[in-house]
Design a protein with these regions (language model features):
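Carbohydrate transferase catalytic cores enriched for Leloir-type hexosyltransferases
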Residues: 1-265
Length: 265
C-alpha cells in the first residue's frame, strides 16, 4: 500500500487545532505511515516531519511534488482580464494572496506590509473567511487600511488566473505549509512571488522567488518594493518562475508516481 502525506501541521503547530482533532489525526497518520509499504510526501519539509515526529525510516518515503491546473499556464485574453477586473471590482494596483484566511496563513503580515508601501498599492486576499479574518480587519481599520484591502470569498476557480495576472506580485506569508500550490499557480501565470521562510515554500517557489520571515512585515514590504521599483527584476523573476514550475508538470508527477508503484510490483 502507498499513503500520501501532505503535511503534519497539526503536530508542528498544535495551537491551530483542537486537542481531540490532533489526537485523531496523530493516530491515523502515524498508523498509516507505519503500515504503508511506501509513503509519498509532497515536499522535503513534509518528509523531514514524518521522520522527526513518527520515527519513520527515510528510505521508505518518496518526495513527489504537487502541481496545479493547466489553465494557469494558458494565455489570458484582454477580454477576460477586463471582465474579471469589473466583476470583482479590482483596484488598479495590487498584490495578491490566495488561501483560506486563517491565522496560520498570516494575512495580518500582508495587511501590515501595506503601511510601508505606496498608498496606491492595495491587497487582494482570495479565500474563505474565518473568525481570524474579522480580527485582521479590525487591525486594518485601526491602521486606516480598510479601503486598501479587498477580500474575495467566492471567486470562481476559472477566474483565478486573471486575478493573479493583474497583480504586481503574489505574497504568501504563511507560517507553515505542506507545499504551497498557490505559489505554483502564481508562477505559472507569470508574476513574481514573495513567500515566507520556515517551511516548504522555498521548495515551491524555487530560486527565482524572494523570501522573508513570516514575522517581519517591513521585510515583506521591502521585498515587494524591490519588485515594484525594478521592472527588470520583476520580469526576470517571472521568467525564472515559469521555468521552475516545469518540474511540477503533470507529466513529471505521473512518471514519478508510476515509477513508485512499479517498484512495489
Amino acid at each position: 500500500s502507498v499513503v500520501t502525506i501532505h503535511d503534519l501541521i497539526f503536530l508542528r503547530y498544535p495551537q491551530f487545532y483542537k486537542p481531540a482533532d490532533r489526537a485523531i489525526y496523530t493516530w491515523k497518520f502515524h498508523r498509516a505511515c507505519r503500515y504503508a509499504d511506501k509513503i509519498v510526501a509532497v515536499s522535503e519539509c513534509t518528509k523531514r516531519d514524518i521522520v522527526d515526529f513518527f520515527g519513520i525510516d527515510p528510505s521508505k518515503i518518496e518526495v513527489i511534488y504537487q502541481g496545479c491546473g493547466e489553465m494557469f499556464a494558458q494565455e489570458i485574453t484582454e477580454a477576460d482580464a477586463i471582465r474579471v477586473r469589473q466583476e470583482y471590482n479590482l483596484p488598479l494596483r495590487y498584490m495578491i494572496t490566495v488561501g483560506t484566511l486563517e491565522s496560520r496563513k498570516n494575512l495580518r503580515e500582508a495587511v501590515e506590509a501595506l503601511l510601508y508601501l505606496p498608498a496606491d498599492m492595495h491587497l487582494v486576499a482570495v479565500g474563505r473567511a474565518t473568525p481570524y479574518t474579522e480580527e485582521v480587519m479590525r487591525y486594518a481599520a485601526q491602521q486606516g487600511l480598510t479601503s486598501r484591502i479587498h477580500l474575495l470569498h467566492k471567486v470562481a476557480y476559472h477566474d483565478l488566473p486573471a486575478l493573479y495576472k493583474r497583480a504586481e506580485a503574489m505574497v504568501y506569508p504563511s507560517y507553515f505549509e505542506g507545499f504551497g500550490i498557490p505559489i505554483i499557480e502564481a508562477m505559472s501565470v507569470g508574476i513574481p512571488v514573495v513567500a515566507a521562510t520556515g517551511s516548504c515554500l522555498e521548495e515551491a517557489g524555487g530560486p527565482g522567488s524572494l523570501y522573508v520571515s513570516p514575522d517581519d512585515a517591513e521585510a515583506l514590504a521591502a521585498a515587494v518594493s524591490r519588485i515594484l521599483n525594478d521592472k527588470e527584476l520583476a520580469a526576470e523573476m517571472a521568467v525564472q518562475g515559469k521555468e521552475y514550475v516545469q518540474r511540477f508538470s503533470k507529466e513529471v508527477i505521473a512518471s514519478q508516481l508510476l515509477s513508485l508503484y512499479d517498484s512495489l510490483l
